[in-house]
Amino acid sequence: MSDILKKIELYKREEIAAAKAAVSLADLKAMQAGQSAPRGFYKALVAQRDAGNFGLIAEIKKASPSKGLIRPDFDPPALAKAYEAGGAACLSVLTDTPSFQGAPEFLTTARDACALPALRKDFMFETYQVHEARAWGADCILLIMASLTDDEAERLQDEAFSLGMDVLVEVHDAEEMERALKLSSPLIGINNRNLRTFEVSLTVSETLASMVPADRLLIGESGIFTHADCKRLQAVDISTFLVGESLMRKDDVTAATRALLFGEAAIAAE
């Protein structure tokens, strides 16, 4: 595990302990009962793929450790509606506060504002967090293989499945990919960002894509800024993408989403 992930795990463990003291598992389960059923994160992405379209997981992200504040004018419900209008298939919402200035209410309010399934984007270490995610309305959780053992990943995955949620398993190298493929989740995300150096390269996705069998849905993450980037990854059978920063920096998020998915020329021709 990188030094960055070790530091994150330290504060997450403290956060989880404090959360458990404040909100019991029974309370979380009661909150889950008041939520609408999971909307089908994987199903929404497969529908786009099967229709021959690019599938977009559009990210609602206020800030990041490497870039600092990304969007000062930050309105999660408005952003969710803008992404939906632009053709996104799903949302990804940051709930981690120390590193990303995220919050649980960003997830809840964004999901409530639209019909899209939503991913809780956070660093998951304990099954309690999975129950938090469902209580807040999440339809999917993220598992970062670089921060988890195989047993931990499987335990978190199975807990999410028991709640009707989907699981996005994130990898950055061949060893993590081999480990991810031992899990049963069909959603595999390739993070093009090195979490040790923050360097980003689409060649990471291009290199690892060939390891993945056809029964998994590959998602390209990080470093995707243009329709040309999407086309480049399509050449290695990646047609689903998680994109945040490049869209968050645009004034017209709906137009930027459409341009990413369909290309500037297609938008201009409408």
Curated annotation (Swiss-Prot):
PANTHER family under this entry?
INDOLE-3-GLYCEROL-PHOSPHATE SYNTHASE, TRYPTOPHAN BIOSYNTHESIS PROTEIN
- Which pathway is it part of? Amino-acid biosynthesis; L-tryptophan biosynthesis; L-tryptophan from chorismate: step 4/5
Species annotation: Rhizobium leguminosarum bv. trifolii (strain WSM2304)
Alphabetical list of Gene3D superfamilies matching this protein: Aldolase class I (3.20.20.70)
Q: Which GO terms describe its biological process?
A: L-tryptophan biosynthetic process
What is this protein's name?
Answer: Indole-3-glycerol phosphate synthase
Please give the family membership noted in the entry.
Belongs to the TrpC family.
User: Mind listing the UniProt keywords for this protein, alphabetically?
Assistant: Amino-acid biosynthesis, Aromatic amino acid biosynthesis, Decarboxylase, Lyase, Tryptophan biosynthesis
Q: Which PROSITE patterns match?
A: IGPS
| An example molecular function term from Gene Ontology annotations | indole-3-glycerol-phosphate synthase activity
Specify whether Transmembrane is a keyword of the entry: no
Give the E.C. number(s). Answer: 4.1.1.48
Q: Which Pfam families match?
A: IGPS
Query: Which residue ranges does UniProt annotate as crossing the membrane?
Result: none
**Reactions catalysed, as given in the entry:** 1-(2-carboxyphenylamino)-1-deoxy-D-ribulose 5-phosphate + H(+) = (1S,2R)-1-C-(indol-3-yl)glycerol 3-phosphate + CO2 + H2O
